[in-house]
UniProtKB/Swiss-Prot annotation:
Subunit structure and binding partners: Heterodimer of LeuC and LeuD.
Gene3D superfamilies for the chain: Aconitase, domain 3
Role: Catalyzes the isomerization between 2-isopropylmalate and 3-isopropylmalate, via the formation of 2-isopropylmaleate.
Positions bound to [4Fe-4S] cluster: 347, 407, 410
Residues annotated as transmembrane: none
Alphabetic keyword roster: 4Fe-4S, Amino-acid biosynthesis, Branched-chain amino acid biosynthesis, Iron, Iron-sulfur, Leucine biosynthesis, Lyase, Metal-binding
NCBIfam families per the UniProt record, alphabetical: leuC, PRK05478.1, PRK12466.1
Taxonomic path: Bacteria, Pseudomonadati, Pseudomonadota, Gammaproteobacteria, Enterobacterales
Gene from which this protein is expressed: leuC
InterPro entries membership: 3-IsopropMal_deHydase_lsu, Acnase/IPM_dHydase_lsu_aba_1/3, Acoase/IPM_deHydtase_lsu_aba, Aconitase_4Fe-4S_BS, Aconitase_4Fe-4S_dom, IPM_dehydratase_rel_enz, IPMI_cat
EC numbers for this chain: 4.2.1.33
CDD domains documented for this protein: IPMI
Gene Ontology biological-process annotations: L-leucine biosynthetic process
The name this protein goes by in its record: 3-isopropylmalate dehydratase large subunit
An example molecular function term from Gene Ontology annotations: metal ion binding
Length: 471
């Protein structure tokens, strides 16, 4: 019997297994940030251990950084302590750090692929749940806890049980205006926010193959919102073209050798998955969440469902609670829901193609009165590229704030956060209660949908937008 891509990656990284025990896997890349690493480095120090493979360990500052200045004091005492601690730990243990003043600083799941640290066939871990992003390259990538961060720092290995496998097939091609964010929200809406629990999900099908690497990263980024351990997409020519020439990618003769191997990284024709789910791309409309988990999502032209229509009592109770928190009523159309804030950014949607999509909507328009809208590029290189293309001017002329790289309003760990009762159209990945600030109400959308909400002052169907007239 053939193997799935996940099974190939898992088996290739087993360094030790004993009957009845969890296999030990080798970890190729370890990504580190300021929030989940301090105790791990303290553990090394207490045991007088070193970092086993510092050349395969990379650190950045992203969660706590200010997006308005590079002042390490800007986001408060805890943020300052965590960032200064990361700097000291990286100096002591010989780990490469992309600090506040490094031109490549940015969100960890943006800079890894951007710098070519993320490679097909590799295992990648980080003390962050959205490490699944890197699976877009055919890498086995998943988030780990702080004790596991310490273990990988010390040994470059990790014990991991085998996961079940799920194949998600997106047949056909998406209509104009439908993005990877819409695809993955539709998948989560179909399966539920726990529908992937215990699985590694492989995305495939014509609609997935048609996506750019940036779109594929969005898909895999939100696999965790299905409850999945990781997301995967088999590498192909699109993958290789993206990686070629990046700083940490193979060079010269090693490049062709690597590509030859990477071409083998796909599920065999006779591989069996534990579950297969198929969606039709042409059935997917622009998506917007209405509740407090990513599975509570609908098409923009669909009214909010009544909890009474849900057969599962747990889902029904969750919907009642979500509607109360979000201050919404069943039957309401999202296009009738006004917003206060717009956030375009996060490890889900802060790459150059995301900013281009939002700028295409913002060009020649203005942010609606009473709406605060911000655009936060995912890294220094993304910011520089956007400015070279004039996207920053499009945004600022439309009334958006153009910020510095960081995790920003994805989570309430820095100065960018919602006030109680504020409603936000957000390109991030989680709409949990209080995720963007205590009492804040988060609606997940694509970059184009977020920009449309900003200029309309309410949610709008991006398919109805036309390019403004130009002289």
């Amino acid at each position: 019997m053939g193997k799935t891509l996940y099974q190939k990656l898992y088996d290739a990284h087993i360094v030790h297994q004993t009957p009845g025990e969890t296999p030990l896997l080798y970890i190729d890349r370890h990504l580190v940030h300021e929030v989940t690493s301090p105790q791990a480095f303290d553990g090394l120090r207490a045991q007088r251990r070193r970092v086993r493979r510092p050349e395969h360990t990379f650190a950045t500052m992203d969660h706590n950084v200010s997006t308005q200045s590079r002042d390490i004091h800007a986001c408060g005492e805890m943020a300052r302590v965590q960032m200064e601690t990361l700097m000291a730990n990286c100096r002591e243990f010989g780990v490469q750090l992309y600090d506040l003043h490094h031109p490549h600083q940015g969100i960890v799941h943006v800079i890894g692929p951007e710098q070519g640290m993320t490679l097909p066939g590799s295992t990648i871990v980080c003390g962050d749940s959205h490490t699944a992003t890197h699976g877009a390259f055919g890498a086995l990538a998943f988030g780990i806890g702080t004790s596991e961060v310490e273990h990988v720092l010390a040994t470059q290995t990790l014990k991991q049980d085998r996961a079940r496998t799920m194949q998600v097939v997106i047949q056909g091609r998406c209509a104009e205006g439908i993005s990877a964010k819409d695809i993955v929200l539709a998948v989560i809406g179909h399966l539920g926010h726990a529908g992937g629990t215990g699985y590694v999900v492989e995305f495939c099908g014509p609609a997935v193959e048609a996506l750019s690497m940036e779109g594929r990263m969005t898909l895999c980024n939100m696999a965790i919102e299905l409850g999945a351990k990781a997301g995967l997409i088999a590498p192909d020519e699109t993958t290789f073209a993206y990686l070629q020439g990046r700083p940490f990618a193979p060079q010269g003769a090693q490049w062709q050798q690597a590509v030859d191997h990477w071409r083998t990284l796909r599920s065999d024709a006779d591989a069996r998955y534990d579950r297969t789910v198929t969606l039709q791309a042409d059935d997917i409309a622009p998506q917007v969440t209405w509740g407090t988990n990513p599975g509570q999502v609908i098409a923009i032209d669909t009214p909010i469902p009544s909890p009474a229509s849900l057969s599962d009592p747990i889902a029904r109770a969750s919907a009642h609670k979500a509607l109360a928190y979000m201050d919404l009523q069943p039957g309401t159309r999202m296009s009738d829901v006004a917003i206060d804030r717009v956030f375009i950014g996060s490890c889900t949607n802060s790459r150059i193609e995301d900013l281009r999509a939002a700028a295409a909507v913002a060009r020649g328009r203005r942010v609606a009165p009473g709406v605060q809208a911000m655009v936060v590029p995912g890294s220094g290189p993304v910011k520089a590229q956007a400015e070279a293309e004039g996207l920053d001017k499009i945004f600022t002329e439309a009334g958006f704030e153009w910020r510095l790289p960081g995790c920003s309003m994805c989570l309430a760990m820095n100065n960018d956060r919602l006030g109680s009762g504020e409603r936000c159209a957000s390109t991030s990945n989680r709409n949990f209660e209080g995720r963007q600030g205590r009492g804040g109400r988060t609606h997940l959308v694509s970059p184009a949908m977020a920009a449309a909400a900003a200029v309309c002052g309410h949610f709008a169907d991006i398919r109805q937008f036309q390019e403004p007239a130009h002289d």
